[in-house]
Amino acid sequence: MKIVLLGPPGAGKGTQAKSISNRYSIPHISTGDIFRKNISENTPLGMEARSYMDKGLLVPDEVTINMVKDRLQEDDCLSGYLLDGFPRTVAQAEALNEFLENRNEQLDTALLIDVPSEFILDRMTGRRVCTSCGGSFHIKFNPPTIDGKCNLCGSDIVQRKDDTVETVKERIDVYDKQTQPLIEFYKSKNLLSMVDGTKAIDQVFEDICKLLGEQ
């Protein structure tokens, strides 16, 4: 089973990806992991990527695509895989499509965990983390017993810079601009599946399994 996982920041993609990977015995392939591995091992592609990153430039699509292609040809991908963070653009989606066609393979589905922007904003801006032990809380869904204090060690809990309203809104805007064309691309190929990401984690996974059972 070959799956592309889509969804906005804060949609719970990481949690669901882990569950899908375990249930279907396929590797969860994250673009971030691929980059880190290539860079730490000083592969030719890793060194090329680093040369752009060191200058504060975006890594060209071609480099990212080639890294992903290399990863998808490893032995653990023979029975399928779950791609998380790739493709991000229609150009990358077309490159993946071409790669699969050349191998007489095809994508089973592009799975979108759909969560409205207001819900994402509520979910992410409410997150708090302990300054000492790293314990995590949510002011609405998992509040501390004493306001502003960690249940585990009593230290202050704070909002991370990544979770401020301004930052979250910016991330949602970037996601919308990048991903909407991608959603339309997979829709046009009848490959898009969608689940409601506002439900409880277990229910979202159950819905995903039902969808994948129909592929």
From Swiss-Prot:
Quaternary context: Monomer.
Protein name: Adenylate kinase
Pfam family, one: ADK
Catalytic activity: AMP + ATP = 2 ADP
CDD domains: ADK
NCBIfam families: adk, PRK00279.1-2, PRK00279.1-3, PRK14527.1
Localization of this protein: Cytoplasm
Family: Belongs to the adenylate kinase family.
GO cellular component term of the entry, any: cytoplasm
Entry-linked HAMAP family: Adenylate_kinase_Adk (MF_00235)
Keyword Amino-acid biosynthesis: no
Major place of residence: cytoplasm
Functional pathway: Purine metabolism; AMP biosynthesis via salvage pathway; AMP from ADP: step 1/1
Enzyme Commission (EC) number: 2.7.4.3
Keywords: ATP-binding, Cytoplasm, Kinase, Metal-binding, Nucleotide biosynthesis, Nucleotide-binding, Transferase, Zinc
Gene3D superfamilies xref list: P-loop containing nucleotide triphosphate hydrolases (3.40.50.300)
Region (LID): 126-163
Residue sites binding AMP per the record: 31, 36, 57-59, 85-88, 92, 160, 171
Notes on the domains: Consists of three domains, a large central CORE domain and two small peripheral domains, NMPbind and LID, which undergo movements during catalysis. The LID domain closes over the site of phosphoryl transfer upon ATP binding. Assembling and dissambling the active center during each catalytic cycle provides an effective means to prevent ATP hydrolysis. Some bacteria have evolved a zinc-coordinating structure that stabilizes the LID domain.
Region (NMP): 30-59
